[in-house]
């Protein structure tokens, strides 16, 4: 009688979506992609989609209630039901589930959690104040997984792990001792680490070199944006800090501003405000949810901002807003990219720098932004290949600079779920 098939599920819980991938054990074969979208939306219904690799199962896509009507904790069980109903996979056969958790503090490896031994979840929930839009929801997802799959082992994998190689002089904040009881030190931690790790692997494979020889600057640009300086495959600096708020502006995040600005902007900035079932300051709500592209352009959709750069496509007011927003975004991005390229160039010759990578939704789709960034880097020998840059094809890794360009430009698709699965494979030894 053949051995019973077992599975690994990688789950990536965001504030507006859940993504996942299902792998066979021990072959590590990718079987299916999972997605839940429109979470928390008052205007659109939640969509649950299961897409199987050819011959592995029956694809399915269904709509549920409106996003703001569905409890977040119920979404993972709903997703599991759709998964098991679309093929022969049984819930009892899902042996491991790995979860993306944004903030892991100083942890340099994942944490295992099983039903009845959930101490790690308590620790992670304490860090929710530092990543209020992500950590708490990830904890809810893990708890719902433990209830739906009581036999399995969950592995919590943190975006902050990749940045544990950052030196003290880079991560230290010049603050006096705190009079608060802190759940972790106040310092730079950095985020998007699972994405950066997957990009290093993909670029190394494309260049046919070991990951520990990759020297690159990455711009992960999406609803949340950050940049990272990577030397010998390891993070040496990154734009996000104690929380994802520091650094580049995002869809609704302000990015780095003078810390006193919020107290002039809002009189009761330090007062409490509720986010679901926990409390943060009003300042954190304004800076995390009401700022960024939304504040400057009135939209979080970067594609709409690009469209409104054409004055014939919108009102004069929207055109002026789009021009300023785009200029601000480009300026802040160049500040970090140039800084990180300088860091690399101060230690390795330009011939040993693998280039500048664009990733994330904006990075992968924003041909105009990529061109404008690379043109500003012409002094380093960057030469844009217009045809490659404007093309929508090219695979996981695509070069967008000319053959003789001294500084290479790349578009690399990120694969957080795939990297999580790799980490789980190493952790569990299958």
From Swiss-Prot:
Residues reported in the UniProt entry to bind substrate: 100
> Which residues of the sequence carry a binding annotation for ATP?
19, 220-224
Name of the protein described by the UniProt record: Probable acetate kinase
Q: Which species is this record about?
A: Cryptococcus neoformans var. neoformans serotype D (strain JEC21 / ATCC MYA-565) (Filobasidiella neoformans)
Has the keyword Transit peptide been applied to this entry? no
Q: Which residues does the Swiss-Prot or TrEMBL record annotate as the active site?
A: 159
* Similarity annotation: Belongs to the acetokinase family.
Q: Which GO terms describe its biological process?
A: acetate metabolic process; acetyl-CoA biosynthetic process
Could you tell me which InterPro entries the record lists for this protein? Ac/propionate_kinase, Aliphatic_acid_kin_short-chain, Aliphatic_acid_kinase_CS, ATPase_NBD
